[in-house]
């Protein structure tokens, strides 16, 4: 499979997953706080930690499949630009405490999710 097509396929899947989870989070938790982006970015951090650890320890994937999963799927799934805009929106509307909670929670939670993903990858990888 062509690398560009593999990335495009993964990105299409990741973007649609992001859209679906974003809709679900808005219906489930409301839109006063960016729950969808928060959940998506933490799941993406968990996923990249797990996947890259498994690839480096156990899984043998072709270059197109690795690109499809990491660059395409996870790249299309997570969204740093939305995180930046939602942080700005909370700050500019005077919601300082929710904004700080969102920013700190996203960065610290993302790092913790990567650590958990790496740990899971090592555990599954033997």
Swiss-Prot record:
Na(+) is not transported, but it plays an essential structural role and its presence is essential for fluoride channel function. It comes from the Bacteria. Keywords: Cell membrane, Ion channel, Ion transport, Membrane, Metal-binding, Sodium, Transmembrane, Transmembrane helix, Transport. It is found in: Cell membrane. GO terms for biological process: cellular detoxification of fluoride; fluoride transmembrane transport. Na(+) binds at residues 75, 78. The chain crosses the membrane at residues 4-24, 35-55, 68-88, 100-120. It holds the Pfam family CRCB. One of its GO terms (molecular function) is fluoride transmembrane transporter activity. It is a multi-pass membrane protein. One of its GO terms (cellular component) is plasma membrane. It catalyses: fluoride(in) = fluoride(out). InterPro entries: FluC (IPR003691). The keyword Ion transport applies. NCBIfam families: crcB. Fluoride-specific ion channel. Important for reducing fluoride concentration in the cell, thus reducing its toxicity. Belongs to the fluoride channel Fluc/FEX (TC 1.A.43) family. This is Fluoride-specific ion channel FluC.
